[in-house]
Amino acid sequence: MEYTYLGRTGLRVSRLCLGTMNFGVDTDEKTAFRIMDEALDNGIQFFDTANIYGWGKNAGLTESIIGKWFAQGGQRREKVVLATKVYEPISDPNDGPNDMRGLSLYKIRRHLEGSLKRLQTDHIELYQMHHIDRRTPWDEIWEAFETQVRSGKVDYIGSSNFAGWHLVKAQAEAEKRRFMGLVTEQHKYSLLERTAEMEVLPAARDLGLGVVAWSPLAGGLLGGKALKSNAGTRTAKRADLIEKHRLQLEKFSDLCKELGEKEANVALAWVLANPVLTAPIIGPRTVEQLRDTIKAVEISLDKEILRMLNDIFPGPGGETPEAYAW
């Protein structure tokens, strides 16, 4: 496994991040334990989750599964760089009228305590804002996070799904307080979704943030099975997406065959080739999927292959640099 620094921090993390969103939903607890053991055995020590995972009435279930795995011992917790998120409501009846989306000091304090309890740990390495809060002032948000960092319950703060200007605003407000602020941004990024190249990646590069890519396989479209799936089993939305990108996916599949590599691994290797990217998040449902995916870090894409991929999946922006989006 390869390792890199988490943004501008001195903390090193694996180039693949284990996503756990399926745990307790599509992946049962026993299989989730095996996946986490296998990941750690192969050097993947960067794990990502969120307090909302498990979804609906089961919100928090994924964190609980990870906590049970930590409780098995074997230095599991000590070996993992753990990231979780806050923002969404998790149907806690004690929250009353505050059971809503947001990043108030009240919510961050209460929901961090809930995450720590479910995860059976006393600290989180990377605590992430799952979305931007347009209502709560930055003074309150940063006061909440600073308090948790000073208490030792949180090491670093990250964001997720922020626009480029949100990152700049957040950092400017943190600097006023002489606080480190953000160290990462988690963002949707793949060969099929390159919008982040217009604003988010340039902002992250300038601010010294590591970018963690979610949905690097574009919801499975780049996984190699989309074109082979039974049309009768597809949802209307899925069928429309496949038809929209059919020509691109066919060309991509042909290129991967020439390279002798699986589509999913080439798609991940492309993300890894971007120097702004810390790691793509992989979300295996089975141990077998994880074993296949780990091979992505061994693939090196030369300039010609990167050019060919860019021809198949052109980035955004047109003729003007970064589209002058700001």
From Swiss-Prot:
* Lineage: superkingdom: Bacteria
Concerning Gene3D superfamilies, the annotation shows: NADP-dependent oxidoreductase domain (3.20.20.100)
Molecular function as annotated in GO: oxidoreductase activity
Q: What class of enzyme is it?
A: oxidoreductase
Keywords, A to Z, come to:
Coiled coil, NADP, Oxidoreductase
Give the coiled coil ranges: 242-305
Q: Which GO terms describe its cellular component?
A: cytosol
Would I find Oxidoreductase among this entry's keywords? yes
The keyword NADP is annotated on this UniProt entry: yes
Chain sites annotated for binding NADP(+): 215-225
List of catalytic residues: 53
Q: Which InterPro entries match?
A: AKR_Detox_Biosynth, NADP_OxRdtase_dom, NADP_OxRdtase_dom_sf
EC id: 1.-.-.-
Q: Which family does it belong to?
A: Belongs to the aldo/keto reductase family. Aldo/keto reductase 2 subfamily.
- Protein name per its UniProtKB record: Uncharacterized oxidoreductase YrpG
Q: Which gene encodes it?
A: yrpG
